[in-house]
C-alpha cells in the first residue's frame, strides 16, 4: 500500500521524536526472520524500554536529520529496522545481540551513541545504572578494607619492633 504525503510526514515526525528522546540507536536487517520471532522481539523490546520500527530508508534519513543519529545514514540500505534505547544506552544493543545469537538471519548493521557510530558489542556490555553503582561500591569497599589491613599490618610490625 502506497503512503500518501501526510502518512509519510507523520512517520518522519514520529521517528524524529523517538530519536530526539533516545540515548542510543541500533540498525538491523530482519529479512528471513519469522513473524512469530519478530513479535516476540517487539514484546521483549517494549519491556526493556526500547522502541522499534521498520522504516523506509528515505523516510529514515529525513527523520534522523539533525539528531545525533545522523551518523547512521550510511547503514540505511535494504530493509531497515531501527531500535531506540530510551532508558539505558545499551538496552537495544543487548536485545539485538541476544536475538541475533538465536536467529542467524537477523543481521545487525550498526549502532550509534552520543553522535558517533559505536561497536554493538561495546554498547551491549555497558553496565546499567544499578550495575555501575554496585561496581563503584565494591571498589570503594575493597579499597577501604585494603587500607585497614595495611594499617593493622603496620601497627603489628611497630609493636613487634618495640617488643
UniProtKB/Swiss-Prot annotation:
Gene Ontology BP annotations: translation
GO molecular function: large ribosomal subunit rRNA binding; structural constituent of ribosome
Record's keyword terms, sorted: Ribonucleoprotein, Ribosomal protein, RNA-binding, rRNA-binding
InterPro entries the record matches: Ribosomal_uL10, Ribosomal_uL10-like_sf, Ribosomal_uL10_bac, Ribosomal_uL10_bac_type, Ribosomal_uL10_CS_bac
Regions annotated as coiled coil: none
CDD domains: Ribosomal_L10
Gene Ontology CC terms, in alphabetical order: large ribosomal subunit
Gene3D superfamilies: 3.30.70.1730, 6.10.250.2350
Assigned protein family: Belongs to the universal ribosomal protein uL10 family.
Function: Forms part of the ribosomal stalk, playing a central role in the interaction of the ribosome with GTP-bound translation factors.
Matching PANTHER family: 39S RIBOSOMAL PROTEIN L10, MITOCHONDRIAL (PTHR11560)
Subunit structure: Part of the ribosomal stalk of the 50S ribosomal subunit. The N-terminus interacts with L11 and the large rRNA to form the base of the stalk. The C-terminus forms an elongated spine to which L12 dimers bind in a sequential fashion forming a multimeric L10(L12)X complex.
Annotated protein name in UniProt: Large ribosomal subunit protein uL10
Amino acid at each position: 500500500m502506497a503512503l500518501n504525503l501526510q502518512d509519510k510526514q507523520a512517520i518522519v515526525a514520529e521517528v524524529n521524536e523517538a530519536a530526539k528522546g533516545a540515548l542510543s540507536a541500533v540498525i538491523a536487517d530482519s529479512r528471513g526472520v519469522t513473524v512469530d520471532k519478530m513479535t516476540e522481539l517487539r514484546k521483549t523490546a517494549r519491556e526493556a524500554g526500547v522502541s522499534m520500527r521498520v522504516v523506509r530508508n528515505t523516510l529514515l534519513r529525513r527523520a534522523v536529520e539533525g539528531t545525533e543519529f545522523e551518523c547512521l545514514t550510511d547503514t540505511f540500505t535494504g530493509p531497515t529496522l531501527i531500535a531506540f534505547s530510551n532508558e539505558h544506552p545499551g538496552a537495544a544493543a543487548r536485545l539485538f545481540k541476544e536475538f541475533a545469537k538465536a536467529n542467524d538471519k537477523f543481521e545487525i548493521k550498526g549502532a550509534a551513541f552520543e553522535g558517533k557510530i559505536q561497536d554493538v558489542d561495546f554498547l551491549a556490555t555497558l553496565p546499567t545504572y544499578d550495575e555501575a553503582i554496585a561496581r563503584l561500591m565494591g571498589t570503594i569497599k575493597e579499597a577501604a578494607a585494603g587500607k585497614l589491613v595495611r594499617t593493622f599490618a603496620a601497627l603489628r610490625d611497630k609493636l613487634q619492633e618495640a617488643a
